[in-house]
């Protein structure tokens, strides 16, 4: 080994010992002929002192930031007045005996310590500099700990780690596939997997019983802060299980991951809510439940109302829901109400009713349309007090829920609400199985075409498919969808029935999903599992807004890699071998 220790690990326990350290020059300064170098590696920094009597003093004097050095030196305590309490190695320094320059560095476009202030494309172009930033190194280390903790947990609980293929067949469901042309099979293509879904279900039919994988998945979709064309997920599947068993496996893994990342393990079991209840209470299927501001159904107050906004909504089978903004009048003025109304319209509403409670009465443009009895009932139902505000949405449930969800999220910011805890997990379960696509006159999977319906709802597949609830679930953490999964269909006849509702003919179903369908009719056990976003989990634990901050070499928002300048044009001979012509 070239070194005896890492820079950040040297402390007063090493005083009077000779250590060999390697790293980058983080900074240098000359104080009265004595050279001070801060030597950095991934663990931290240590101060190196090169005295003028040192035989390598002249060589060390040529070192500049980001030069790579090997230093042999004696560890000593700093004088009391020179101790740096902000550095874990701040009590000691290393007096150099030998200095060797292992490599020089050109003038860099930015200093690693300042990389987080640089525009993202430049950071990604020079990622080898950006990753030297201590925050980035911490993020990658945390990601590693998350992956290792997940592996340990599943390995210790009877799961087998199995790799599934990266080159597979295209099944045009969900996002677009990344296609890979075959040289050997002219005119045919592989697809990169959007998930290991069919393979892991086939493994359950194969008797594997418990599978896990740190899996790569690929989706050709428009990007956001929490999306990449390629991502990593902690993927599991289990045989002979109920929803409760799958939840317990996820909760156990999360506990180990949090401990590995230096966080307190969250209390289990996590809170569970039905999809319909979550949408009614929070207006979102991935709510941040740390904030105590809820949506309330107030339709019962207005059953005989003359205010057409609410009466028409109720007459057409819609809902009327409200959010109380505690002391909202202290934070929200008329201009802000107009912006909230614009937000409601952008989210699908025709408008937004708002009221302010002051001097024991409601005020606002719409107050005059309500009767005294309705306003009194509203005040009682929502426990409205002085300076509170009320925001009301009225329309079809599928319109009101997301609108009020958007208003809730904005009110959390406007009211400067504080979360009531650091971490809040929520299992959202029993999503609708299907949703209707009117322009195509067919049903489509609300989440996953392989999700099982609730047993009691199976008869509804023949009469009212839109009312069928499923064993689909999401795990939400602080308003972020962390995992998605379900109990699967393990019978071919039921799976084909659902695919038929989605207008997959038997021939199409056999062509696209034949591998899985054949496995299901060969004695597949009941099974279920989930895929959890490793990138998202690491980003949350690192308190990062974007998953790009926890991925070593991510793409930009346009799926471009500035470091490798890909995607790129390839040579004609390569295209010819693949039987491809570019027009």
UniProtKB/Swiss-Prot annotation:
Q: Where is this region: Aspartate?
A: 197-200
Q: Name one GO biological process term.
A: aspartyl-tRNA aminoacylation
Q: Give the E.C. number(s).
A: 6.1.1.23
What residue stretch is flagged as signal peptide?
none
Question: Main localization of the protein?
Answer: cytoplasm
Q: Which reaction does it catalyse?
A: tRNA(Asx) + L-aspartate + ATP = L-aspartyl-tRNA(Asx) + AMP + diphosphate
Q: What residues does the record give for site: Important for tRNA non-discrimination?
A: 31
Domain of life the protein comes from: Bacteria
Q: Which GO terms describe its molecular function?
A: aspartate-tRNA ligase activity; aspartate-tRNA(Asn) ligase activity; ATP binding; nucleic acid binding
A cellular component annotation (GO) from this entry: cytoplasm
Q: Where does L-aspartate bind?
A: 173, 219, 447, 488
The record, for SUPFAM superfamilies, names: Class II aaRS and biotin synthetases, GAD domain-like, Nucleic acid-binding proteins
Q: Which residues bind ATP?
A: 219-221, 228, 481, 533-536
Q: Where in the cell is it found?
A: Cytoplasm
A Pfam family: GAD
Q: What UniProt keywords apply to this chain's record, in alphabetical order? A: Aminoacyl-tRNA synthetase, ATP-binding, Cytoplasm, Ligase, Nucleotide-binding, Protein biosynthesis
Q: What InterPro entries has UniProt attached to this entry? A: Aa-tRNA-synt_II, aa-tRNA-synth_II, aa-tRNA-synth_II/BPL/LPL, Asp-tRNA-ligase_1, Asp-tRNA-ligase_1_N, Asp/Asn-tRNA-synth_IIb, AspRS_core, GAD-like_sf
Q: Give the family this protein belongs to, as stated in its UniProt record.
A: Belongs to the class-II aminoacyl-tRNA synthetase family. Type 1 subfamily.
Assembly description? Homodimer.
Query: NCBIfam families annotated for this entry?
Result: aspS_bact, PRK00476.1
Q: What does this protein do?
A: Aspartyl-tRNA synthetase with relaxed tRNA specificity since it is able to aspartylate not only its cognate tRNA(Asp) but also tRNA(Asn). Reaction proceeds in two steps: L-aspartate is first activated by ATP to form Asp-AMP and then transferred to the acceptor end of tRNA(Asp/Asn).
Instruction: List the protein's name.
Output: Aspartate--tRNA(Asp/Asn) ligase
Tell me which species this is from.
Elusimicrobium minutum (strain Pei191)
């Amino acid at each position: 080994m070239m070194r005896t220790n890492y820079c950040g690990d040297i402390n007063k326990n090493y005083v009077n010992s000779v250590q060999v350290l390697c790293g980058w020059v983080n900074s240098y300064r000359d104080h009265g002929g004595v050279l001070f170098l801060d030597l950095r590696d991934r663990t931290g920094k240590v101060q190196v002192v090169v005295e003028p009597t040192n035989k390598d003093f002249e060589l060390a004097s040529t070192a500049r930031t980001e030069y790579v050095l090997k230093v042999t030196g004696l560890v000593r305590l700093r004088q009391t007045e020179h101790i740096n309490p902000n550095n874990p190695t701040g009590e000691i320094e290393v007096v150099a005996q030998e200095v060797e320059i292992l490599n020089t560095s050109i003038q860099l476009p930015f200093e690693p310590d300042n990389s987080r202030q640089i525009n993202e494309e430049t950071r990604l172009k020079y990622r080898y500099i950006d990753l030297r930033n201590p925050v980035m190194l911490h993020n990658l280390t945390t990601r590693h700990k998350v992956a290792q903790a997940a592996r340990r947990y599943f390995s210790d609980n009877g799961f087998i780690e199995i790799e599934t293929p990266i080159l597979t067949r295209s099944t045009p469901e969900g996002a677009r596939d990344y296609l890979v042309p075959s040289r050997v099979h002219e005119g045919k293509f592989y697809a990169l997997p959007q998930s290991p879904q069919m393979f892991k279900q086939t493994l359950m039919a194969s008797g594997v019983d418990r599978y896990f994988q740190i899996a790569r998945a690929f989706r050709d979709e428009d990007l956001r802060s929490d999306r990449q064309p390629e991502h990593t997920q902690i993927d599991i599947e289990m045989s002979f299980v109920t929803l409760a068993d799958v939840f317990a496996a996820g909760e156990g893994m999360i506990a180990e991951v949090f401990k590995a990342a230096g966080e307190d393990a969250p209390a289990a079991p996590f809170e569970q809510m039905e999809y319909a209840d979550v949408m009614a209470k929070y207006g979102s299927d991935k709510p941040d439940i740390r904030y105590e501001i809820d949506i309330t159904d107030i339709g019962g107050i207005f059953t005989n109302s003359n205010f057409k906004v609410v009466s028409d909504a109720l007459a057409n089978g819609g809902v009327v829901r409200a959010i109380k903004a505690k002391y909202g009048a202290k934070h929200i003025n008329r201009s802000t109400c107009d912006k909230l109304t614009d937000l409601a319209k952008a989210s699908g509403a025709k408008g937004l009713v708002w009221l302010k409670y002051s001097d024991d009465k409601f005020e606002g443009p719409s107050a005059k349309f309500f009767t005294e009895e309705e306003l009194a009932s509203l005040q009682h139902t929502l426990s409205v007090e002085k300076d509170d505000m009320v925001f009301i949405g009225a329309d079809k449930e599928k319109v009101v829920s997301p609108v009020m969800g958007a208003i809730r999220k904005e009110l959390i910011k406007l009211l400067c609400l504080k979360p009531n805890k650091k971490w809040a997990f929520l299992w959202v379960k029993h999503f609708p199985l299907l949703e209707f696509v009117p322009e195509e006159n067919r049903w489509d999977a609300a989440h996953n075409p392989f999700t099982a319906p609730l047993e009691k709802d199976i008869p509804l597949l023949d009469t009212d498919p839109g009312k069928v609830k499923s064993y689909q679930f999401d795990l939400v953490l602080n308003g972020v969808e962390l995992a998605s999964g379900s109990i699967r269909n393990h019978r071919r006849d039921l799976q084909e029935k659902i695919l038929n509702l989605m207008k997959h003919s038997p021939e199409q179903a056999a062509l696209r999903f034949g591998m899985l369908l054949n496995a299901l009719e060969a004695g597949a056990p009941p099974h279920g599992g989930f895929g959890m976003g490793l990138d998202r989990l690491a980003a949350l634990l690192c308190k990062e807004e974007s998953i790009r901050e926890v991925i070593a070499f991510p793409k930009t928002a346009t799926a471009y890699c500035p470091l490798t300048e890909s995607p790129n044009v390839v040579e004609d001979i390569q295209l010819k071998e693949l039987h491809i012509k570019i027009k």
